[in-house]
């Protein structure tokens, strides 16, 4: 038994090792953590190093090993085991436990014994709990060589850890870097289960791998799990930091291989699976399944809050990301499958065993983009396909549920092909192998099938190979939310019906095709046409709903003449309910699309059949094409619609060879879609024939296609702005700027000092009620003011003041707000007249900078910056000393307050951004009429109290008016403020305490009207002379 325990002094950053290189094999390695080179410095052994380490109950070199409560970093390095497992200890153990320790490092340990465990091997549980940073770097178990096909037992498992079960719980960080095993588990291998839980920092598996060391024996099956290999289940859950699997490779499961389920649950930060590979060959045949995950049971992503990335992973055979029995994605943040590849199944391989599959959004979208099949078989090469599902006959259900929650999407930018699942002696419409889209009312989002990110060359390749989105052999139901086919995508239902329930929307966009094939049907109850793409004048065509003119169930070989569907007289397309016009977000088109100009004879839908008996009875009446809309915001106008019918002849072929160079994607569209919509005669359309590599002509079949085109015209008559985006808050902000200026001027009154320097802090609260259909708001501001006063020999007084304040204004019933900063300068003078009359005048300039934030729903927002200027004036007349009442002087007064506010032009950015320009500035003149009472004591310190009340009518009022344009749709309207009451009452009270040359004061003002309540408070001090 050998024990190597050295304390370690190093600077350690618990981040993922982007690169980890060994600079000198004879010395401890330098690691590069996060771009910084970290050097290991080993100090001489000491007795402290072995604290709380026990090796108990040793029997035949097997026992329970425990490391606990070490306060110093522990280093286990350069162990070599050739006669037993466990490279760091040269012995395997019954169990291994590390608990409550400082950093633990297992580096450069090597085990050539077939028992495995490059660092640690235990026949029972391996447990790491409540430790700080844990690093397994460059540990290896490899060396046992076998030849021949009979030896199928795995050897050299677990490049770092090999145990019956492994638990890594409540540690600060876990890093498995550059570990290697011969067979299962390049870093970690278990006979039963693996649990990684409650890690506060990063969990990183990088550059781990297995080696296929049994030649020509399908050894990739054994060398599985490039980072983790479990014969049981794997659970990675409740971790706070990011979880990273980067650049691992193995035979089956480039990152993780499990015999049971593999679950990622309740993690708080990112999950990243990048650059992992499943690699292997048998003779000249490709092997290697599941570039990231190969699970014998379910693969689940459940309630993970951060974004999840599967990117740039590849498998040499099947599944560019995940190979498993079934998928379960629910309640996660956004999920991205990007740029993954495999020979078959760019993203997924499903075993086609009875199970329920769920691809549901949580708080973010799910996006599939550029997941590619690298098949070498003809036209399939290079196509972006997601699934590989082996065809099977199974009497127990294999189901798929696609669900997008409110304000989320599932985007399929790659080909979605689901099918080949059958039940014996059962017609397709009764098959238990169903697909459900948005299964319950909580799923009100959209499932989108789009060719938006597919190049025109690849689309031409797809057309030539007759490859598109499809669901085959599985009855499909669209229950809630939206299913959208757009941006040139084609979707075919084959050997199974699509049934839409009236609580959902089936949306079709530009150049899209919805096809019903042999032994299938479409039941459409609410059809949406995505209008903006049809109005862009860029050569786009209206969407099509069609019966496939070719019977794909017979005569599909290239040397056979295709069979058409013109003799199929069975009803295949059933229409009922409305046709609606929607925008790219599947919402009302009137407030998002530019309908400012009229449109005539615009095709918005084509319905194509080879036999009109394929349409439901009286379909033109059961499909409501009146385009009538309930009262709505946005453009107002009138739609008219009518049907036009034309015919054409197309030639069918069975060619799946690469098309000739002159058959571009646009040429194919022209031949299949473009014809004179005013003609009712048959037009002969040249067939698109691919090169066969020889001179033998292809067998063709001509078929007549009848097209019914829905053509509409639009006449605009006006625009009504949606109150949510009308801009009331900006106009209210201008009114508030004027009110704040006059409130300040009203309190700007000189005192009896000869000279004074004054400073104060102030706050203002305003609450505006909702009136008519205009939003109310509340605002709060705080700031400071400084002033200087001087008095002349004849009672003249001059006062200069400056104030700065910040204000936040929030609109009621929305999340819109404006943050403002104001800079106000004012000059005040007092002129005594006839001993008893005083005239007090003031002028102010108030400059404001503003940031506006507007929120629409949960994902859309706009913001903008602007500034405003306010000019204010005040003239006050007081009749003094005329009404003494004991020690209180009552003084009547009348005052005129004027303000004028103008903003600069405002242009927002973001969703639903608007442009505001000034039509009419805000001007207000109010005249408080009231009485002031003043009390002053003769004792030291002098106490003074002052109170005034007034009735304040509005003498002149001009509402601010802004010309507003919604940039997205060119809709325009006028924006103004929430109506205000014309009469209000005003009160002010102040108190001061004077100590010789120091005066302390506080005052409060309130203005009350039926529409608005304002409270102004300030307090401060002054030096008076």
Swiss-Prot record:
Keywords: Cell outer membrane, Cell wall, Membrane, Secreted, Signal, Transmembrane, Transmembrane beta strand
GO cellular component: cell outer membrane; extracellular region
Subcellular localization: Secreted, Cell wall; Cell outer membrane
Keyword Secreted: yes
Positions with biased composition (Polar residues): 659-681
Membrane topology: Peripheral membrane protein
Residues covered by the Autotransporter domain: 748-1025
Keyword Transmembrane: yes
Taxonomic superkingdom: Bacteria
InterPro entries recorded: Autotransporte_beta (IPR005546), Autotransporte_beta_dom_sf (IPR036709), Polymorphic_membr_middle (IPR011427), POMP_repeat (IPR003368)
Residues annotated as signal peptide: 1-20
Region (Disordered): 654-681
Coiled-coil region list: none
Pfam families: Autotransporter, ChlamPMP_M
Similarity field: Belongs to the PMP outer membrane protein family.
Protein name, as recorded: Probable outer membrane protein PmpF
Organism of this sequence: Chlamydia muridarum (strain MoPn / Nigg)
Classification of source organism: Bacteria, Pseudomonadati, Chlamydiota, Chlamydiia, Chlamydiales
């Amino acid at each position: 038994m050998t024990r190597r325990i050295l304390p370690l002094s190093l600077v350690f950053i618990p981040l993922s090792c982007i690169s980890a290189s060994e600079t000198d094999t004879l010395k401890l390695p330098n690691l590069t953590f996060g771009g910084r080179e970290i050097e290991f410095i080993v100090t001489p052994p000491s007795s402290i190093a072995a604290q709380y380490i026990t090796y108990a109950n040793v029997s035949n070199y097997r026992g329970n090993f425990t490391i606990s409560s070490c306060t110093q970093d522990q280093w286990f390095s350069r162990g070599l085991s050739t006669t037993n497992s466990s490279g760091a200890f040269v012995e395997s153990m019954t169990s291994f436990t590390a608990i409550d320790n400082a950093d633990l490092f297992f580096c450069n340990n090597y085990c050539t014994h077939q028992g495995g465990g490059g660092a640690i091997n235990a026949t029972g549980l391996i447990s790491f709990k409540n430790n700080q940073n844990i690093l397994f770097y460059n540990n290896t178990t490899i060396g046992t060589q076998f030849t021949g096909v009979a030896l199928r037992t795995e050897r050299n498992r677990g490049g770092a850890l090999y145990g019956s079960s492994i638990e890594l719980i409540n540690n600060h960080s876990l890093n498995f870097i550059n570990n290697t095993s011969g067979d299962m588990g390049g870093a970690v291998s278990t006979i039963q289960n693996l649990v990684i839980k409650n890690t506060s920092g990063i969990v990183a598996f990088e550059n781990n791998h297995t080696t296929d060391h049994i030649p020509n024996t399908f050894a990739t099956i054994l060398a599985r799990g490039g980072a983790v290999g479990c014969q049981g289940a794997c659970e990675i859950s409740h971790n706070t930091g990011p979880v990273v699997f980067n650049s691992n490779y193995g035979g089956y499961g480039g990152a993780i291989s499990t015999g049971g389920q593999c679950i990622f649950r309740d993690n708080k930060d990112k999950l990243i699976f990048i650059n992992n590979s499943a690699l292997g060959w048998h003779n000249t045949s490709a092997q290697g399944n599941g570039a990231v995950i190969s699970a014998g049971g379910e693969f689940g992503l459940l309630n993970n809050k951060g974004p999840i990335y599967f990117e740039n992973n590849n498998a040499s055979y099947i599944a560019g990301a995940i190979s498993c029995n079934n998928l379960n994605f629910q309640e996660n943040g956004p999920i991205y499958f990007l740029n993954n590849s495999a020979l078959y199944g760019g993203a997924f391989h499903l075993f086609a065993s009875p199970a329920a599959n769920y691809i549901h959004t949580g708080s973010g979208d799910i996006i599939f983009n550029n997941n590619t099949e690298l098949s070498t078989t003809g036209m399939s090469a290079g196509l972006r396909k997601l699934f590989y599902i082996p065809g099977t006959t199974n009497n127990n259900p294999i189901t798929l549920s696609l669900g997008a929650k409110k304000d989320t999407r599932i985007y399929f930018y790659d080909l979605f092909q689901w099918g080949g699942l059958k039940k014996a002696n059962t017609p397709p419409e009764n098959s238990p192998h169903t697909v459900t889209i948005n299964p319950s009312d909580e799923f009100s989002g959209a499932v989108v099938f789009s060719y938006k990110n597919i190049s025109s060359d690849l689309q031409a390749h797809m057309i030539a190979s007759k490859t598109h989105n499809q669901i085959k052999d599985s009855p499909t139901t669209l229950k809630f939310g939206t299913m959208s086919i757009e941006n040139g995508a084609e979707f075919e239902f084959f050997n199974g019906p699509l049934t839409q329930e009236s609580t959902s929307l089936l949306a079709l966009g530009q150049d899209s095709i919805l096809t019903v094939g042999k032994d299938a049907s479409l039941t459409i109850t609410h059809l949406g046409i995505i209008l903006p793409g049809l109005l862009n004048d860029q050569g786009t065509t209206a969407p099509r709903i069609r019966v496939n003119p070719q019977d794909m169930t017979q005569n599909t070989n290239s040397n056979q003449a295709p069979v058409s569907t013109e003799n199929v007289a069975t009803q295949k397309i059933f229409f009922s309910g409305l046709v609606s016009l929607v925008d790219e977000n599947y919402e009302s088109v009137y407030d998002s699309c530019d309908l400012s100009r009229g449109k005539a004879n615009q095709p918005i839908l084509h319905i194509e059949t080879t036999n009109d008996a394929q349409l439901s009875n009286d379909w033109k009446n059961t499909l409501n094409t009146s385009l009538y809309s309930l009262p709505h915001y946005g453009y107002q106008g009138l739609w008219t619609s009518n049907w036009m019918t034309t015919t054409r002849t197309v030639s069918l072929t069975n060619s799946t060879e690469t098309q000739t160079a002159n058959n571009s994607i646009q040429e194919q569209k022209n031949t299949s879609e473009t014809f004179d919509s005013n003609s009712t005669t048959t037009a002969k359309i040249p067939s698109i024939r691919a090169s066969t590599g020889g001179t033998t002509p292809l067998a063709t079949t001509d078929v007549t296609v009848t097209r019914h085109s829905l053509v509409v015209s639009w006449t605009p008559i006006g625009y009504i702005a949606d109150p949510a985006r009308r801009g009331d808050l900006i106009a209210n902000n201008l009114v508030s700027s004027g009110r704040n200026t006059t409130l300040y001027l009203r309190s700007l009154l000189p005192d009896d000092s000869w000279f004074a320097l004054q400073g104060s802090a102030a706050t203002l609260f305003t609450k505006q009620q909702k009136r008519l259909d205009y939003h109310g708001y509340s605002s709060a501001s705080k700031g400071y003011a400084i002033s200087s006063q001087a008095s002349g020999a004849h009672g003249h007084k001059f006062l200069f003041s400056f104030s700065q304040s910040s204000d936040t204004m929030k609109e009621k019933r929305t999340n819109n707000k404006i943050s403002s900063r104001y800079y106000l300068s004012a000059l005040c003078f007092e002129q005594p007249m006839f001993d008893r009359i005083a005239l007090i005048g003031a002028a102010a300039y108030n400059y404001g900078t503003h940031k506006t934030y507007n929120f629409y729903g949960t994902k859309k927002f706009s913001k903008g910056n602007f500034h405003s200027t306010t000019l204010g004036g005040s003239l006050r007349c007081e009749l003094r000393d005329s009404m003494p009442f004991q020690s209180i002087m009552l003084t009547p007064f009348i005052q005129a307050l004027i303000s004028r506010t103008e903003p600069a032009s405002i242009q927002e950015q973001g969703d639903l951004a608007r442009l505001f320009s000034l039509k009419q500035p805000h001007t207000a003149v109010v005249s408080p009429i009231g009485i002031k009472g003043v009390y002053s004591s003769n004792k030291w310190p002098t106490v003074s109290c002052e109170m005034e009340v007034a009735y304040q009518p509005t003498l002149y009022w001009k509402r601010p008016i802004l010309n507003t344009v919604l940039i997205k749709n060119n809709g325009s309207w006028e924006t103004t403020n929430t109506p205000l009451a014309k009469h209000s009452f005003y009160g002010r009270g102040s108190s001061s305490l004077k100590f010789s040359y120091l005066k302390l004061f506080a005052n409060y003002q309130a203005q009350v009207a039926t529409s608005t309540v304002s409270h102004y408070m300030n307090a401060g001090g002054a030096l008076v002379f």
